[in-house]
Amino acid sequence: MIPVVIEQTSRGERSYDIYSRLLKDRIIMLTGPIEDNMANSIIAQLLFLDAQDNTKDIYLYVNTPGGSVSAGLAIVDTMNFIKSDVQTIVMGMAASMGTIIASSGTKGKRFMLPNAEYMIHQPMGGTGGGTQQTDMAIAAEHLLKTRNNLEQILADNSGQPIEKVHVDAERDNWMSAQETLEYGFIDEIMTNNQLK
């Protein structure tokens, strides 16, 4: 169930679902697994807010276990394409593809709440049963290219050498807010609403 917010206007009362009301304040909620429909919704909101006023920041709150690489990269590409600065605020967790998105916010405007967690790892893939050996080789090559691309993005976003990112992302690597800050994925740990 999505909560509804009632607002008093000069014309009377107006009700919004909570996400529409937050969008009015340039806030986008990226929550849950990253998949195509969710990514398309986030992209549409980014494009709408940028077209509305590209001189104002957009606030992207992130709480996700990760998900589809292609859907996540579509969000990242849109964040980089629009003119508006995108502030990212990690709450709960940014894991897997979520770390790519959260760390791709505008440098100097990447935040994390004190009890949130970050997790990097190598991308996962599979070919399923009954797959021909040639198809398995193609899938393995694609997975390796994807891993190299994601590690380069993480290296660029954190300022860490790609070799370090490669080693650190070999297995699930969970980080506290302080560790995430020290690694370079975020710029500040928020202890109150500093975005106003």
Curated annotation (Swiss-Prot):
Record-listed E.C. numbers: 3.4.21.92
Localization: Cytoplasm
Active site residues of this protein: 96 (nucleophile), 121
Function: Cleaves peptides in various proteins in a process that requires ATP hydrolysis. Has a chymotrypsin-like activity. Plays a major role in the degradation of misfolded proteins.
Enzyme class, broadest EC rank: hydrolase
Membership in a protein family: Belongs to the peptidase S14 family.
Example GO molecular function: serine-type endopeptidase activity
Pfam families, per the entry: CLP_protease (PF00574)
Keyword annotations of the record: Cytoplasm, Hydrolase, Protease, Serine protease
Subunit-structure text: Fourteen ClpP subunits assemble into 2 heptameric rings which stack back to back to give a disk-like structure with a central cavity, resembling the structure of eukaryotic proteasomes.
Protein name: ATP-dependent Clp protease proteolytic subunit
SUPFAM superfamilies, per the entry: ClpP/crotonase
